[in-house]
Swiss-Prot record:
Keyword line: ATP-binding, Host cytoplasm, Hydrolase, Magnesium, Metal-binding, Nucleotide-binding, RNA-binding
Organism from which the protein derives: Rotavirus A (strain RVA/Cow/United States/NCDV-Lincoln/1969/G6P6[1]) (RV-A)
Location in or out of the cell: Host cytoplasm
Residue ranges of the region described as RNA-binding: 205-241
EC number per UniProt: 3.6.4.-
GO cellular component: host cell cytoplasm
GO MF term list: ATP binding; metal ion binding; nucleoside diphosphate kinase activity; ribonucleoside triphosphate phosphatase activity; RNA binding
Function per UniProt: Participates in replication and packaging of the viral genome. Plays a crucial role, together with NSP5, in the formation of virus factories (viroplasms), which are large inclusions in the host cytoplasm where replication intermediates are assembled and viral RNA replication takes place. Displays ssRNA binding, NTPase, RNA triphosphatase (RTPase) and ATP-independent helix-unwinding activities. The unwinding activity may prepare and organize plus-strand RNAs for packaging and replication by removing interfering secondary structures.
Name of the protein this chain belongs to: Non-structural protein 2
Leading EC class: hydrolase
Domain of life: Viruses
Family: Belongs to the rotavirus NSP2 family.
Assembly and interaction partners: Homooctamer. Interacts with VP1; this interaction is weak. Interacts with NSP5; this interaction leads to up-regulation of NSP5 phosphorylation and formation of viral factories. Interacts with host DCP1A, DCP1B, DDX6, EDC4 and EIF2S1/eIF2-alpha; these interactions are probably part of the sequestration of some host SGs and PBs proteins in viral factories.
Length: 317
């Protein structure tokens, strides 16, 4: 995760802003600079290579002292920064909005995946600039649209029906901020269209999840799509979701947290996110992840007859 201010800076032109991507040498200057505390939140002028991000975001970049940041010296950093600028420059951002826009925390890996989709000649985003920019504006939280299958970050499609598409995420192969744990495996489910979904299509998805992904929890980050994650990683997801939710509220970026379909979401996660929305502390919310929940009455009794036992997946074992 990183703020938009880690990728670009605003340049006032008439009554709105044009956004310009940072270059890696300017960032490198900022990372070595001694800056007064009072100037930590201001864009840094490298003198030689142009404007750099505010020094308060130093930890967002990979250095000798911090291996968890972005690999900003890779070509992918520039591609992501340029893509963000293209999207922001396609809309009007005024002086009253610019601080709020740049403070938004975004998924770096999501943006890298959109770059990969853009470069894939077989992908609809390669052929449609309008759809590409819509996808980016959704990814950076500047659109009220939810991420649907056409505007999704992408990955490897492992399941699809008339209503849903399930993707295997490819973060292990990333350049900008790769997942280093070689045991990482995670999926994302997007709706094909933002409209009511028939019970039969929900039933098909739940059957697939129950039999092929029975070692995983179905959760949501509140953005209109589902994530299918290992139970061992649920607590980590909870920390991130809670931190992003609080950060957005603090910065005035109040975005409705979409709890999604309770029949699909893991019961404990639904309790966690509901508690978070009510304003409870992280400690109180996380306790709900580890409590034994009273089983809801199964809205889809008989699902077990939809698959034979020899079809049960070993994924995640």
């Amino acid at each position: 995760m990183a703020e938009l201010a880690c990728f670009c800076y605003p340049h006032l032109e008439n009554d709105s802003y044009r956004f310009i991507p940072f270059n890696s040498l300017a960032i490198k200057c900022m990372l070595t600079a001694k800056v007064d505390k009072k100037d930590q939140d201001k864009f840094y002028n490298s003198i030689i290579y142009g404007i750099a991000p505010p020094p308060q975001f130093k930890k967002r970049y990979n250095t000798n002292d911090n291996s968890r940041g972005m690999n900003y010296e890779t070509p992918m950093f520039n591609k992501v920064a340029v893509l963000i600028c293209e999207a922001l420059n396609s809309i009007k951002v005024t002086q009253s909005d610019v601080a709020s826009v740049l403070s938004k925390v975004i998924s770096v890996r999501h943006l890298e995946n959109l770059v990969l989709r853009r470069e894939n000649h077989q992908d609809v985003l390669f052929h449609s600039k309008e759809l590409l920019l819509r996808s980016v504006l959704i990814a950076i939280g500047h659109s009220k649209e939810i991420e649907t299958t056409a505007t999704a970050e992408g990955g490897e499609v492992v399941f699809q029906n008339a209503a849903f598409t399930m993707w295997k995420l490819t973060y292990l192969e990333h350049r900008l901020m790769p997942i280093l744990d070689q045991n990482f495996i995670e999926y994302k489910i997007t709706v094909n269209e933002d409209k009511p979904i028939s019970e039969s299509h929900v039933r098909e998805l739940i059957a697939e999840l129950r039999w092929q992904y029975n070692k995983f929890a179905v959760i949501t980050h509140g953005k209109g799509h589902y994530r299918v994650v290992k139970y061992s990683s649920v607590a980590n997801h909870a920390d991130r979701v809670y931190a992003t939710f609080k950060s957005n509220n603090k910065n005035g970026n109040v975005i409705e947290f979409n709890l999604l379909d309770q029949r699909i979401i893991w019961q404990n996660w639904y309790a966690f996110t509901s508690s978070m929305k009510q304003g409870n502390t992280l400690e109180i919310c996380k306790k709900l992840l580890f409590q034994k929940m009273k089983r809801e009455s199964n809205p889809f009794k008989g699902l077990s007859t939809d698959r034979k036992m020899d079809e049960v997946s070993q994924i995640g074992i």
